[in-house]
Amino acid sequence: MSIWRPPLHNVPGLEHLWYESVHRSHAAVCGCGDPVRHLTALAERYGIPGGSRSSGAPGVGGNHNPPQIRRARHPAAAPDPPAGNQPPALPWHGDGGNESGAGGGESGGPVADFADDGLDDLVAALDEEERRLQYPRETTKRTETVDERKRERSRSPRRDAGGLGPRAAPAAAPRAVSTPKRAQVPLRAVSQNPTGSPRRSLPRVGPEQWLLPERKPKPAPTSGDWAMEYLMCKIMNRPPRSQLTDPPFYPYCKNNYNVTFQLNYK
């Protein structure tokens, strides 16, 4: 089942649509702006492509042998392209034209209904998207480098005098020798459950006298302690003590000293 339908345009409209399609297909692959000259040069180089034709289709020129291709005249110089990256204006949909409207200058030409297709809007949207990809819009966000430091206002009440040259930077002061610091004592971990049961006390190591000697009374001296005291009195030639906690007394040692410091100050 064939889905082909007859075209909706007349002969001039079909010719203009075909001419416009040639221009657009050429502009998609080349930017010289002259598709006729380009096709002529390609035809001189490669010739007319051969291939099977449908039954009853006439050959080029009414016979099967193609005629010799003539070189086209050089067209007039193309106008200067407009400023910016806009493509050159195509020869249709202009601001004015002849009365017949064959060039598409007026909206009342034979291809007036072609402008209602929205093809121009589609092509303009594609051009805008391509231009946006080629030239991305600059972002206003400032990128700070690693070495950049924030400038702060000086606290000095003096202001720089106008017209004076830049002042020389003062010499850097020698760095003071850092004093050694004590090692930081690690803090005890805080309980993660403050509402729970209180923390248990740490177990004590050793007897009570080692931990709190001032708060506990000392034990009474034994017979062995007194025997050691009398032995030391015999050896050191001193009298015994009444209490073992008292300091010992040595009678042969002087307890009053007369010290004279002779300092030769001038």
From Swiss-Prot:
Superkingdom to which the source organism belongs: Viruses
What ranges does the record list as Pro residues composition bias? Answer: 78-90
Residues covered by region (Disordered) = 50-116, 128-224
**Leader sequence residues:** none
Q: Which Pfam families match?
A: TT_ORF2-like (PF02957)
Biased composition (Gly residues) is annotated at 94-108
User: Could you tell me where the Basic and acidic residues compositional bias lies?
Assistant: 129-161
InterPro entries referenced in this protein's UniProt entry, alphabetically: HEV_TT_vir_Orf2/Gyrovir_Vp2_N
Could you tell me where the Low complexity compositional bias lies?
A: 166-176
Protein name as catalogued: Uncharacterized ORF2/4 protein
